[in-house]
Amino acid sequence: MSLLAQLDQKIAANGGLIVSCQPVPDSPLDKPEIVAAMALAAEQAGAVAIRIEGVANLQATRAVVSVPIIGIVKRDLEDSPVRITAYIEDVDALAQAGADIIAIDGTDRPRPVPVETLLARIHHHGLLAMTDCSTPEDGLACQKLGAEIIGTTLSGYTTPETPEEPDLALVKTLSDAGCRVIAEGRYNTPAQAADAMRHGAWAVTVGSAITRLEHICQWYNTVMKKAVL
């Protein structure tokens, strides 16, 4: 049975939650062994897959979880706004570390390596390709190039202002066009994640609301301060 078929079964049985275990950079939690522990806890709680940034974190996580891992490498480049898995060597390193799915930036922005080249390299390793997109045009273009999974990850992050709510319209548009969509980006409540599934998402990735303790504390503190001022 193919990995996609296995995931289809798991999603049907468990609801399609993917947990992104990416601590705040330089956080006390930003250690491979802690990332792996969070991933294992997420798997035991019913996550159908895990999203991991960085080769060391992926290696540590691969050693303890059996669910599929979506691997990425983030870089801050001087000559490109693209941050997610921008180079062939990133794809190779993630494949060697044990990723099952490799996600890349799928936006139509200046980049060091074309999307189609990165997709070909992912498929060379026999892995599934996911593209993190920001618009319907991005997603449909990546689908035509052969990406098996389209993520709404970058919706709201390629424009001057980022909305507070997730982009359900993008989920529906891509799903209606026949894309296998992972809804991602600002899904901070179970209700929002369920709404994404109702809009046609194949699965939903949740990060900050589960694994970024600093963000969660800040949300509480912001609201609680308003209550006493």
Curated annotation (Swiss-Prot):
Q: Which UniProt keywords apply?
A: Carbohydrate metabolism, Isomerase
A Gene Ontology biological process in which this protein takes part is: N-acetylneuraminate catabolic process
What InterPro entries does the database record attribute to this sequence? Aldolase_TIM, NanE, RibuloseP-bd_barrel
Pathway per its UniProt entry is: Amino-sugar metabolism; N-acetylneuraminate degradation; D-fructose 6-phosphate from N-acetylneuraminate: step 3/5
Q: Name one GO molecular function term.
A: N-acylglucosamine-6-phosphate 2-epimerase activity
Enzyme class, first EC level, given as a word: isomerase
| Domain of life of the source | Bacteria
GO cellular component terms, semicolon-separated: cytosol
By its UniProt entry, which SUPFAM superfamilies does this protein fall under? Ribulose-phoshate binding barrel (SSF51366)
Family matches, as Pfam families:
NanE
Q: What is its EC number?
A: 5.1.3.9
CDD domains reported in the protein's UniProt record: NanE (cd04729)
Q: Does the keyword Isomerase apply?
A: yes
Q: Reaction catalysed? A: an N-acyl-D-glucosamine 6-phosphate = an N-acyl-D-mannosamine 6-phosphate
Q: Does the keyword Isomerase apply?
A: yes
- What NCBIfam families would the database entry show? PRK01130.1 (NF002231)
Role played:
Converts N-acetylmannosamine-6-phosphate (ManNAc-6-P) to N-acetylglucosamine-6-phosphate (GlcNAc-6-P).
Q: Which family does it belong to?
A: Belongs to the NanE family.
According to UniProt, the name of this protein is Putative N-acetylmannosamine-6-phosphate 2-epimerase
Organism whose genome encodes this protein: Escherichia coli O127:H6 (strain E2348/69 / EPEC)
Coding gene?
nanE
